[in-house]
């Protein structure tokens, strides 16, 4: 790309340089580096946080927030049990947790997706919509999950429930993209699934020599917690957000003072998800042996202490589902779950058996995966059920919806009964396999450790550098079976307009506040690196 520049209101200059190598290939993230600035500088700390929010300009909103149903469509009572088809307890336990995730269930029951889906085969959102609808509308019954849900994953033996859970979430996220294949990574993070489960990490490195700050932002769908030295979820989160000193051989190569210097590194949550998936790392990556210890977890969890912006009031989440593993190794044992129905009653979902439980029993389990939802979200859904309010979805005109329904053919696969055809199972198997998915996950696993990147060349003083990274999956043309994968991570190249939007500080959703101070007389070079 040729270098070019743009002056905006006589204040900002945009220059394009070659992209630096990213530390994590799967995510669209950005890094900010700046020199220490005077207190009244237009790039003061408060303004810098606001700028951090603008690192992901959205070219296309794939699932506008107003499209999410306002009120609950879920039945108040608990739904059906799930038949074990042979070593599929991990599938059943994961599906029950997703089924009782209020925003996801409400969206599925609204049938918003199936009315506009143009994929006739292998759509995970359509498959999950059929499953959730059957499960919630058949209380007291036992249903058989569709084979398409685990096609390409299940190999006749027990697998890891968390891996299957994220396999399904990733597949649903990919299903949101068929009509938007050329969108950038930032726009992909506006999908329905990311709006429900997603947020952004912020890894901040502060040079102790020049006090320059480097911020790296990375999207997440779940949060892995190390429980080796933790007795509770809160302790594990504190360890995750604890500042790390970088010195000696691990010293930071500062891109501002252009030397190796001691630094402090802190990992925090920059934006919060509607639904938090917390996975307790109970299994050894080498042996698969289980850390069979009791880790306390609360019914209500305040995430504010772990956010990038402190002192903004409590950010309370409430527990609504727990996935449990009983056994001594990830290679054997049994999975089941506890879920909270709409009316507030807890139930134990053990394959076909559905039994009432208590919060005391729920909180005494050796949990593997915890599901929390923002308290305001849970109360809103519960209130709509108690009032018996007629549900509706925002952002869609009723007349347009009726017209869309009239245009759909009766044999549209997305509107068929939950039992899917064999060709759908075969197609899903061809599109994604467990081994391929695990291979991608190893490359793309969200980690709290972020590699420090070296900034080449000499930078002028008081310069602001934004590194825009992009990921190319590495799928070659001579591997069509890889190109067709449900979990293929497509590449995207930031456009010139996207770079402009970054500089103009277009607001990204988050919790940061916009600075009120602005020096209109100074000019600072803004280098957008691709």
Swiss-Prot record:
Predominant location category: nucleus
Polar residues biased stretches: 493-505
GO biological processes: apoptotic process; protein deubiquitination; proteolysis; regulation of apoptotic process; regulation of protein stability
Keyword set, alphabetical order: Apoptosis, Endoplasmic reticulum, Hydrolase, Nucleus, Protease, Thiol protease, Ubl conjugation pathway
GO cellular component term of the entry, any: endoplasmic reticulum
GO molecular function: cysteine-type deubiquitinase activity
Enzyme class, spelled out: hydrolase
Domain of life: Eukaryota
Family annotation (InterPro entries): HABP4_PAIRBP1-bd, Papain-like_cys_pep_sf, Peptidase_C19, Peptidase_C19_UCH, USP_CS, USP_dom
Subcellular location: Nucleus; Endoplasmic reticulum
SUPFAM superfamilies according to UniProt: Cysteine proteinases (SSF54001)
Domain USP: 80-375
Region ranges (Disordered): 382-412, 477-530
Extent of Basic and acidic residues compositional bias: 382-392, 398-412
Catalytic reaction annotation: Thiol-dependent hydrolysis of ester, thioester, amide, peptide and isopeptide bonds formed by the C-terminal Gly of ubiquitin (a 76-residue protein attached to proteins as an intracellular targeting signal)
Bias (Basic residues): 510-524
Enzyme Commission no: 3.4.19.12
Residues annotated as catalytic: 89 (nucleophile), 334 (proton acceptor)
Family note: Belongs to the peptidase C19 family. USP17 subfamily.
Function: Deubiquitinating enzyme that removes conjugated ubiquitin from specific proteins to regulate different cellular processes that may include cell proliferation, progression through the cell cycle, apoptosis, cell migration, and the cellular response to viral infection.
Protein name (Swiss-Prot/TrEMBL): Ubiquitin carboxyl-terminal hydrolase 17-like protein 5
Organism (species): Homo sapiens (Human)
């Amino acid at each position: 790309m040729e270098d070019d520049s743009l002056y905006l209101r006589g204040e900002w200059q945009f220059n394009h340089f070659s992209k630096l190598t990213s530390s994590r290939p799967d995510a669209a993230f950005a890094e900010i580096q700046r020199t220490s600035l005077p207190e009244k500088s237009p790039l003061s700390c408060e303004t810098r946080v606001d700028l951090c929010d603008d690192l992901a300009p959205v070219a296309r909103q794939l699932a506008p927030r107003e499209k999410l149903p306002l009120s609950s469509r879920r039945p108040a009572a608990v739904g059906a049990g799930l038949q074990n088809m042979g070593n599929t307890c991990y599938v059943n336990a994961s599906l029950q947790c997703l089924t009782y995730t209020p925003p996801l269930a409400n969206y599925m029951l609204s049938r918003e997706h199936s009315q506009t889906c143009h994929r006739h085969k292998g759509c995970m959102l359509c498959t999950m919509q059929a499953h959730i609808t059957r499960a919630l509308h058949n209380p007291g019954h036992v249903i058989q999950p569709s084979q398409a849900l685990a096609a390409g994953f299940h190999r006749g033996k027990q697998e890891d429930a968390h891996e299957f859970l994220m396999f399904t979430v990733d597949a649903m996220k990919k299903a949101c993209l068929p009509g938007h294949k050329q969108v950038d990574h930032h726009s992909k993070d506006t999908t329905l699934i990311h709006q429900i489960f997603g947020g952004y990490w912020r890894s901040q490195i502060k040079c102790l020599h020049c006090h320059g700050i480097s911020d790296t932002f990375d999207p997440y769908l779940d949060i892995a917690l190390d429980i080796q030295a933790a007795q509770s979820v809160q302790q594990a989160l504190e360890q995750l957000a604890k500042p790390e000193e970088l010195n000696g051989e691990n010293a930071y190569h500062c891109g501002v003072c252009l030397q190796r210097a001691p630094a402090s590194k802190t990992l925090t949550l920059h934006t919060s998800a509607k639904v938090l998936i917390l996975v307790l790392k109970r299994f050894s990556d080498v042996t698969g042996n289980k850390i069979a210890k009791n880790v306390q977890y609360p019914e209500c969890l305040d995430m504010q202490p772990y956010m990038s912006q402190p002192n903004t009031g409590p950010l309370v989440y409430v527990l609504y589902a727990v996935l449990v593993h009983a056994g001594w190794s990830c290679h054997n044992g049994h999975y089941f779950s506890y879920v909270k129905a709409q009316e507030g009653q807890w139930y134990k979902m053990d394959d076909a058996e559905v039994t009432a439980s208590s919060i005391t029993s729920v909180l005494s389990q050796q949990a593997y995966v915890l599901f929390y939802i923002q308290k305001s979200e849970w109360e809103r859904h519960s209130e709509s059920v108690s009032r018996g309010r007629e549900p509706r979805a925002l952002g869609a005109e009723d007349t347009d919806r009726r017209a869309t329904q009239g245009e759909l053919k009766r044999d549209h696969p997305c509107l068929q009964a939950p039992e899917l055809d064999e060709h759908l199972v075969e197609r899903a198997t061809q599109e994604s396999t467990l081994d391929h998915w695990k291979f991608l996950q190893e490359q793309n696993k969200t980690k709290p450790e972020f590699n420090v990147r070296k900034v080449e060349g000499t930078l002028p003083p008081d310069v602001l550098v934004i590194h825009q990274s992009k990921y190319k999956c590495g799928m070659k043309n001579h591997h069509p079976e890889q190109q067709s994968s449900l979990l293929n991570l497509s590449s995207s190249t930031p456009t010139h307009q996207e770079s402009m939007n970054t500089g103009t500080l277009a607001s990204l959703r988050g919790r940061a506040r916009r600075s009120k101070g602005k020096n209109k007389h100074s000019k600072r070079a803004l280098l957008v690196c691709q």
